[in-house]
């Protein structure tokens, strides 16, 4: 009995997804190394995880040399530029989304190859990873700002509490002096002593 074919779809369980990613990433890198040795080819491999972490590996030639060859070929054939190369000069997410939307509209045609769709899917995943990383960065900055404000408010409250304590002591000391003063004991001057009768 042959092995059951595993359906290729997104793994919902986060832990299982991470384990599968690590295993398949290592397997892919090993396959790339074997391809380089068996066929004498140069292989460069870039992998971006769902958390935005980049992994890369090269076999045959160095990564820099392979990338240099890639850039030369891209310059000779501009039509092969992928979405990332086309959008590297765009600064806003709005412009990026507009380009993605246009690509999706183009993909509705019948002349789009499966390779183009797969490439576009990978570009969208990369864009989402960048956006998620930026979102996390902004949230961390917001949390830090809130923590700084909380710390500042606590320090101000501490200073105010100290000032209130000092005022209370001053008021209490003033009341004690007023009570001990002879003129304030009954509200009148002390009575004069009558002379003794001779």
From Swiss-Prot:
Descriptive protein name: Protein MADS AFFECTING FLOWERING 5
Example of a GO cellular component annotation carried by this entry: nucleus
Compartments it resides in: Nucleus
Superkingdom per UniProt: Eukaryota
Listed GO MF terms: DNA-binding transcription factor activity; DNA-binding transcription factor activity, RNA polymerase II-specific; protein dimerization activity; RNA polymerase II cis-regulatory region sequence-specific DNA binding
MADS-box domain ranges (all copies): 1-61
Biological process annotations from GO: flower development; negative regulation of flower development; regulation of photoperiodism, flowering; regulation of short-day photoperiodism, flowering; regulation of transcription by RNA polymerase II; vernalization response
Induction context: Up-regulated by vernalization. Repressed by VIL2, AGL6, CLF, EMF2 and FIE via epigenetic chromatin H3K27me3 and H3K9me2 regulation during the vegetative development.
Domain K-box, first and last residues per copy: 80-173
């Amino acid at each position: 009995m042959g092995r059951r074919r595993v359906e290729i779809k997104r793994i919902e369980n986060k832990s299982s997804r991470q384990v599968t990613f690590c295993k398949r990433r290592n397997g892919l890198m090993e396959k790339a190394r074997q391809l380089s040795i068996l066929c004498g080819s140069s292989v460069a491999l870039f992998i971006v995880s769902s958390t935005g972490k980049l992994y890369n590996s090269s076999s045959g030639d160095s990564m820099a040399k392979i990338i240099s060859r890639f850039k030369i070929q891209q310059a000779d054939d501009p039509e092969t530029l992928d979405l990332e190369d086309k959008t590297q000069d765009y600064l806003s997410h709005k412009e990026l989304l507009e380009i993605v939307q246009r690509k999706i509209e183009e993909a509705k045609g019948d002349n789009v190859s499966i390779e183009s769709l797969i490439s576009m899917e990978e570009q969208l995943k990369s864009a989402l990873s960048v956006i998620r990383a930026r979102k996390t960065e902004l949230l961390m900055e917001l949390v830090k700002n809130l923590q700084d404000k909380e710390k500042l408010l606590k320090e101000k409250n501490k200073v105010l509490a100290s000032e209130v304590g000092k005022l209370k002591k001053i008021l209490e000391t003033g009341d004690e002096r007023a009570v001990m003063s002879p003129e304030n004991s009954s509200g009148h001057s002390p009575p004069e002593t009558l002379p003794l009768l001779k």
